[in-house]
Amino acid sequence: MKKILAIAPYPYLPYFSGGQKFIAQFLEHLADETELTVIGVETNDPSTVSNYRLLPWLKKTFTRYMDLRLIGRISREVKTGGHEALICEHPYLAWLCWLVSKKTGIPWYLHTHNIEYQRFRSMGKWWWPILQFYERWAFRKANKLFFITPEDRAFAVKNWNIPDTKCMDLPFGVTIPGYPSDKAVKKQEVSTRHGIAPDETLILFNGLLSYKPNLDALMAILEKINPLIMASSDFRYRIIVCGKGLPDNLNALQEYKEQHIIYAGFVEDIESYFTAADLFLNPVQSGGGIKTKMVEAIAYGATVIATETGATGILREVCGEKLITVPDNDWTSFAKAVTDQRESLFVTPHSYYEYYYWKNLARRIASRL
């Protein structure tokens, strides 16, 4: 097996956000194909790791992004451990990986989760031009790059003159190898848990609600989309909202209880909710990159209704009838798409799992390292 060293720049164990989950699951499945060591933040929970070595060398404070002592420490680990390649999650520690590569001679790979400067620009951060300059530098210095979306890869090639030969696709993966056989059972379980009638369409929204793009999407559901759905008097449904970080001023969505809204908070078995759901809503308007929760929802058999921005990054040709997109900010069309779908009879195509199943992804990446 190839010996690989990876650096994960922020806490990801246990995971709560899509970004954390992406790192955790990618490294877990990569470790099945390689002999993997990961350098992470000291606040990670090592008890959740079973198949790779986790070194808690990164400080929990922001100073970890400028800790020059890591250059020598990681270089020594590369030499004594016999590592053949270095993977950098996100561009934030690209400077460190570049210097370690120069000292040791091993290639380094940049695993991008978004075009980061675009994400922060869409969120109104003043310092996005600084990140843009640094991120472009990192792309050019890396030996190879993994891209989460075809759009990000095309942007790098066209706008930053990155050779396409340096680029590889690495989408957010799913742990389920095929269409679930227990959708009816899971729907009954979740419906019973929340007092939902058997003839009501179960609609799901999920995400880390302290993240502004997700919170904005939730407010669009509450204030724009749901009132339009309610106007369709013959449509029986409930919308379950899952996710931690809901602002206190929304009072656990108590004022929306009579408007078909259920707030479930953070749920440990989110896969059960994905499997139970008839529809999944993704009215995201900003944030960049792929919406990982949407990838999982389709894998577990839900039909996704998404804005064009929300559908960014997903490989649409493998989704079949399970992805419905509407223009951004067209909430009338969004609500109509929901009521038109109701309980979808379509199943997720086999080609979807061929592309997004984690084991397939890890094997493809390991063969290229």
Language-model-detected regions and their locations in the chain:
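Conserved catalytic-core segment of nucleotide-activated headgroup transferases in glycan assembly
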Residues: 22-28, 176-252, 263, 267-268
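Acidic donor-binding loop of glycosyltransferase active sites
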Residues: 143, 275-289, 302
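Active-site proximal beta-strand in glycosyltransferases
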Residues: 4, 101-120
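Carbohydrate-associated surface elements
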Residues: 151, 173
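Short hydrophobic beta-strand element within catalytic cores of glycosyltransferases
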Residues: 293-296, 303-308
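N-terminal subdomain of nucleotide-sugar transferases
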Residues: 1-45, 81, 232
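Membrane-proximal helix-turn-helix segments that form the acceptor-binding/catalytic region
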Residues: 126-145
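A charged, aromatic-enriched C-terminal amphipathic alpha-helix characteristic of glycosyltransferases
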Residues: 343-369
